[in-house]
């Protein structure tokens, strides 16, 4: 049984390009982001991979990435489940602010703490711990059972929601996951054993 799980962060969004805190705001992909998503699909197809089900967030940039990946793989119309449990970390009052402007307004050290600490949230927003607490129940209840049934599964989501999955799959500490950067449009492949432990993990690169 092939217990395949592939994670891919959405391609570059319009707000990534503008260096804005995005969170639950809903910009679309840039042309580069579209290219990144298509490249991810082409890389997965070149590996001879296929999927039985895809999961994505409620946000356009992730859904569009998922659609483009599947198109490149010849899987248009694949069963795709969108849920806000997989949304990006909510940056609250920082959402829509340029990151340099936020540093000027709140101070560089404070913004660094909000971005890079595990359990401190910006005003009105989520910490990474909050994001993990939102994402993991959905993973355990919905996505993981799919994988363990042998359904080859794609998850197209966001840097921080995917960090939550990487954290549990790779058994990383909060400190370890904070150091982990996930590139846009770069697939990560996992194969799981019957006990849900990772038997294979690799980055799929050009």
From Swiss-Prot:
Signal peptide: none
MF terms in GO: phosphoglycerate mutase activity
Active site: 10 (tele-phosphohistidine intermediate), 88 (proton donor/acceptor)
Enzyme Commission number(s) from the entry: 5.4.2.11
Keyword annotations from UniProtKB, A to Z: Gluconeogenesis, Glycolysis, Isomerase
SMART domains: PGAM
Binding of substrate, residues: 9-16, 22-23, 61, 88-91, 99, 115-116, 159-160
Annotated catalysed reactions: (2R)-2-phosphoglycerate = (2R)-3-phosphoglycerate
InterPro entries documented for this protein: His_Pase_superF_clade-1, His_PPase_superfam, PG/BPGM_mutase_AS, Phosphogly_mut1
Keyword Isomerase in record: yes
GO biological process: gluconeogenesis; glycolytic process
UniProt-annotated site: Transition state stabilizer, residues: 158
Pathway: Carbohydrate degradation; glycolysis; pyruvate from D-glyceraldehyde 3-phosphate: step 3/5
Function statement: Catalyzes the interconversion of 2-phosphoglycerate and 3-phosphoglycerate.
UniProt similarity note: Belongs to the phosphoglycerate mutase family. BPG-dependent PGAM subfamily.
Assembly description: Homodimer.
Protein name: 2,3-bisphosphoglycerate-dependent phosphoglycerate mutase
Gene source species: Azorhizobium caulinodans (strain ATCC 43989 / DSM 5975 / JCM 20966 / LMG 6465 / NBRC 14845 / NCIMB 13405 / ORS 571)
């Amino acid at each position: 049984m092939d217990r395949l799980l592939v994670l891919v962060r959405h391609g570059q969004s319009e707000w990534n390009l503008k260096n804005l805190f995005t969170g639950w705001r809903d910009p679309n992909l840039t042309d580069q982001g579209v290219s990144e998503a298509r490249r991810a699909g082409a890389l997965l197809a070149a590996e001879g991979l296929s999927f039985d089900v895809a999961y994505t967030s409620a946000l356009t940039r992730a859904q569009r990435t998922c659609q483009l990946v599947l198109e490149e793989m010849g899987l248009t119309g694949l069963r795709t489940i969108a849920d806000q449990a997989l949304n990006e970390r909510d940056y609250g009052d920082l959402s829509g602010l340029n990151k340099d402007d936020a540093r000027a307004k709140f101070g560089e050290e404070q913004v660094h703490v909000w971005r890079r600490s595990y359990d401190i949230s910006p005003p009105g927003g989520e910490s990474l711990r909050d994001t993990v607490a939102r994402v993991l129940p959905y993973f355990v209840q919905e996505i993981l059972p799919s994988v363990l049934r042998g359904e080859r599964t794609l998850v197209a989501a966001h840097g921080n929601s995917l960090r939550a999955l990487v954290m549990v799959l790779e058994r990383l500490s909060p400190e370890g996951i904070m150091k982990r950067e996930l590139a846009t449009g770069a697939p990560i492949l996992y194969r799981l054993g019957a006990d849900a432990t990772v038997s294979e993990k690799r980055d799929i690169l050009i």
